[in-house]
Amino acid sequence: MTFYISSSLTPTHFSKPLNPSNTLFPSQFRGSLSSFVRRRKPTEAKLSSKFNLFPSRRNGLITCCSTSSFESTESSVSQEEDAESNRLFEKLRETERERLSNMEELERKANVQLERQLVMASDWSRTLLTMRGKLKGTEWDPETSHRINFSDFMKLLDSNSVQYMEYSNYGQTISVILPYYKDGEPLGEEEDSKKEIIFRRHIVDRMPIDGWNDVWKKLHQQIVNVEVFNVDVVPAEVYTTVATFVVWSMRLALFVSLYVWIDSITRPIYAKLIPCDLGTPTKKIRQPLKRQALGSLGKSRAKFISAEEKTGVTFDDFAGQEYIKRELQEIVRILKNDEEFQNKGIYCPKGVLLHGPPGTGKTLLAKAIAGEAGLPFFAANGTDFVEMFVGVAASRVKDLFASSRSYAPSIIFIDEIDAIGSKRGGPDIGGGGAEREQGLLQILTEMDGFKVTTSQVLVIGATNRLDILDPALLRKGRFDKIIRVGLPSKDGRLAILKVHARNKFFRSEDEKEELLQEVAENTEDFTGAELQNVLNEAGILTARKDLDYIGREELLEALKRQKGTFETGQEDSTEVPEELKLRLAYREAAVAVLACYLPDQYRPISETDINSIRSQPNMRYSETSGRVFARKSDYVNSIIRACAPRVVEEEMFGIENLCWISAKSTLEASQRAEFLILQTGMTAFGKAYYRNQRDLVPNLVPKLEALRDEYMRFAVEKCSSILQEYQSALEEITDVLLEKGEIKADEIWNIYNTAPRIPQKPVRPVDEYGALIYAGRWGIHGVSLPGRVTFSPGNIGFATFGAPRPMETQIISDDTWKLVDEIWDKKVEEIKAEAVIQIEEEKKKPQILMATHFF
């Protein structure tokens, strides 16, 4: 083995690698090294000393001694030199081995990098050629052809006819690429080189789940060469160099520059075409999360409650309407195949619909069923089904019913079902309305469709709007029972209060019973939720006052808070100017006088003040229990009372000095008159019900205005007459308000009963038929002169005398009638005078006597 030594002993200076078979080991090298040392010259010694080959003797000198001493010295030196040389060459051998392994690793990585670059270049070239259509019909870009069965694919594998395969969707879909002649004939056993060959892709249809095992067994028998690249390991093994970094940086810079240039050109164009699409981009989620989100759109969002779970709510928590509890408990027993109903041919209803005002306990009943039925329970909301994507509502409904049938017998509860069960063909038919209707149709199909299912699933729906639900959803066979959960009665309210008063502290049971009885009497038309809130508010007030028990004062205060009429008296007072204070005093005094003259038995007055500046009167009323059954006189009296602020301000300050504090009084009076005419059916306008003026045909609008003006005329005149009659009471109440700032109901009644009265002329009553007759006539001549009777289209019986245009109307006032009478009388007098003149002229003319006169 020949090797060269340079100025320093490093592995990189060997021109040829060491060969272990030709290397001199210490046992073979010992003798030659000793003789070499003995025979070397001083120059060689200097050379060896320079290169540190023999460090143990580099400072020593070779001297001549006696034979015995020289031999012993030579023997010891030879042993030291042999040991040192062994260490030296062992170090050289390890260093050379490390260098060779590093070179082999570098060469392997370079080959891997080159191979990856070649593969990438071939892939890019193949992709570009495919995009340009150069590889159309080859094995890289085959033509799409018909599907083949899995059995045919296995026959191809058995005959070793499969050369190319593709798989996608994680191996769930496989395709086989087969060669064909261009004229469409398949290749035979002997290939014709003159004909052109094309490749076609055939997707394998209906592949079994475990079909890959058979496919791989067949393919492994035909594999000739397999090349596997671990895409996660190979890039990590390739060393990044400066050149690679520079090249990829240039590529990235070129790509970014190209993107910015294209964006700068196209953005103004898109800004003009689609200006709404260029907003701030939203944060994008990762692709797997996107796929997961899109895949979960069709899944049901209903909350599942197993048979063993408890909701914390039982039927004991629902009080007031015991018959509803009995109905639902009986339905649950039928659903669970109770022995009482098994042999009687009774089937469980498919659906139960709970409807009623908000807060009456519909959702509470569903929670109680979920807690006590002992059956799987699915709770959903009507808004959970509809999304912005088409088909999501139907898919979620289908998934909900499929899940419930897998747990049958089970219960589905859909709260606010009107969100998806509204009538079809409404104003929201486009867009989201069509998607909602698809969900509704799926519910109809699942509840009672063509497909018959034996799984017992009970659907419970809850809604506040039964009137807007689709009739197909309400028919028997879908919702077999429709139960109204209405407002509780007095006994029901007492039972509800007892349920919610379990954890409340009262002084004694007798006092508790008495207070709850009083609250139940004063809370007519209260729902269960409102009663619960009353007791909770009373508990808050008790804690605020640092009391141990709930008392009557706290309950009444909580009741006022619930009704929205509670005032603490600690509100900030506003500075009221003297002139405005006088106006407020007259306004409140007028309202008080009218309330005493025309009392409202359902709203007795309580007190009033002038401490707050509002457009509405400050009069406060006492609430009475019971329902209000208003008569026509009550409506008319309310119209008169509403006119009091405007009338008193006009009489006291003049029509030129009106201000905003009485602005809403005439508006309120006009609205009440319109309500009386349109919605009560108590007037000559007719018994038909109209929600507002927009429901009227054009011919009836003038009649409504005429009748409303007639009621407003009567209300203003009557209110003015009452205030003039009780002028002294009005002034006295005003003085009390200016002095004290407030006045109670007892003092108001005392002043009203003791004040002197000034009699007034009776007010002309309301003439409903006269107002309707005058309304709609056309012009003076049409009224005064006789003519033909014509009927307005769409309004049978509406007659106008000589009216050429019945659609146009004009109201004739009393002054106009007086003017018509004057014109008529004047015209008659003129005609009479002309007749008298003509007669006198006739008398003055000479008479011609005929001959016959003498005979």
UniProtKB/Swiss-Prot annotation:
Main location: plastid
Expression (tissue specificity): Ubiquitous but preferentially expressed in young leaves.
Keyword flag Protease: yes
UniProt keyword annotation of Chloroplast present: yes
Localization per Swiss-Prot or TrEMBL: Plastid, Chloroplast thylakoid membrane
SUPFAM superfamilies tied to this protein: FtsH protease domain-like, P-loop containing nucleoside triphosphate hydrolases
Quaternary structure and partners: Homooligomer. Interacts with FtsHi2.
Role: Functions in chloroplast biogenesis and chloroplast division. Required for plastid development during embryogenesis. Might be involved in chaperone functions or play a structural role in the thylakoid FtsH complex.
Family assignment from sequence similarity: Belongs to the AAA ATPase family.
Protein name: Probable inactive ATP-dependent zinc metalloprotease FTSHI 4, chloroplastic
Species this protein is from: Arabidopsis thaliana (Mouse-ear cress)
